C-alpha cells in the first residue's frame, strides 16, 4: 500500500525508506536454546489484550489446537484469559521485553489489520525469534514474504486453525525454525537505525547533486 500510494501520489522517481528500529537491545538479549534443553518451546505475543485487532483471541484459539508441548508468554495490558500453558506478564519495560523475546523460540503476530509497519516483528527477529504473522500487507513487507527466502511464516488472516498448523509445523521442525530465526536476524538488520540512516543520507546527497537514487 505504501509503495503504491507513493508511486501514484509522488511519481515513479520517489524513494521509499523503511522505518528505522533500534535493534541493538534485542540483539544483545538473544539467549539461544541449548541443544539438550528439553523445556517446551516458548511462544510470545505482545499487544493490548482487549483490542480485538491485536488478535490475542485468535492466538489462544490456535494454541488450544496445538498438540505439542509449549508455553506462551503474553505481554501487554488488559484482561487476562486464563487458559493452560499461558502466562501473562502484563506491561513490561523495554529491557524486560527484550529479555522475554531473547528467551523465546517463536513470536506470533496475529493482528488482523490497522498496522502500517510492524516494529515488534523487527524487534522479535533481532532477538532471535522465528516470526509467525498474519498475512496482512505490513507484515508481508517486514517478513519479505514475496522473496525466495522469507524471514517469517505467514498464516491466513484471522484463521486460528491455520495459525495452529503453522505453530505445530515450527515446533516439529527445529531445522526450519532455525532457518527462520537466522533469516529474521538478517532481515532485522535492514531496518536497523544505522542502516536506515545511511539510506536517508544517500537520498539527501543525491537530491543535492541531482542524481537518481538507487536503494540497495
Role assignments for model-derived ranges:
Residues 98, 121-126, 137-141:
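Short alpha-helical segment that forms part of, or immediately flanks, the ligand-binding pocket
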Residues 6, 145-160, 169-174:
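Conserved acidic donor-binding segment of nucleotide-sugar-dependent glycosyltransferases
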Residues 76-99, 106:
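Nucleotide-activated donor-binding/catalytic signature segment of Leloir-type glycosyltransferases, i.e.
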Residues 35-54, 60-64:
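Conserved donor-binding/catalytic core segment of Leloir-type glycosyltransferases
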Residues 169, 193-216:
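C-terminal alpha-helical cap of glycosyltransferases
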Residues 106, 130-133, 140:
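Short hydrophobic beta-strand element within catalytic cores of glycosyltransferases
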Residues 176-190, 201-202, 206:
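A short, well-ordered alpha-helix in the C-terminal region of glycosyltransferases
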Residues 1-16, 21-25:
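A short, active-site helix/loop in glycosyltransferases that binds the activated sugar's phosphate group
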Amino acid at each position: 500500500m505504501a509503495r503504491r500510494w507513493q508511486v501514484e501520489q509522488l511519481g515513479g522517481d520517489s524513494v521509499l525508506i523503511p522505518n528505522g528500529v533500534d535493534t541493538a537491545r534485542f540483539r544483545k538479549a538473544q539467549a539461544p536454546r541449548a541443544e539438550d534443553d528439553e523445556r517446551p518451546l516458548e511462544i510470545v505475543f505482545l499487544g493490548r489484550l482487549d483490542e480485538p485487532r491485536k488478535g490475542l483471541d485468535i492466538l489462544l484459539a490456535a494454541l488450544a489446537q496445538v498438540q505439542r508441548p509449549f508455553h506462551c508468554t503474553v505481554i501487554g495490558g488488559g484482561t487476562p484469559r486464563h487458559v493452560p500453558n499461558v502466562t501473562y506478564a502484563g506491561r513490561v519495560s523495554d529491557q524486560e521485553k527484550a529479555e522475554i523475546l531473547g528467551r523465546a523460540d517463536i513470536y506470533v503476530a496475529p493482528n488482523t489489520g490497522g498496522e502500517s509497519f510492524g516494529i515488534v516483528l523487527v524487534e522479535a527477529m533481532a532477538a532471535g525469534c522465528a516470526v509467525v504473522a498474519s498475512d496482512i500487507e505490513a507484515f508481508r513487507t517486514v517478513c519479505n514474504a514475496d522473496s525466495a527466502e522469507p524471514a517469517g511464516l505467514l498464516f491466513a488472516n484471522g484463521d486460528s486453525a491455520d495459525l495452529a498448523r503453522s505453530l505445530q509445523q515450527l515446533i516439529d521442525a527445529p531445522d526450519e525454525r532455525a532457518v527462520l530465526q537466522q533469516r529474521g536476524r538478517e532481515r532485522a538488520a535492514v531496518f536497523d537505525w544505522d542502516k536506515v540512516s545511511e539510506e536517508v543520507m544517500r537520498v539527501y546527497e543525491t537530491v543535492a547533486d541531482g542524481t537518481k537514487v538507487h536503494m540497495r
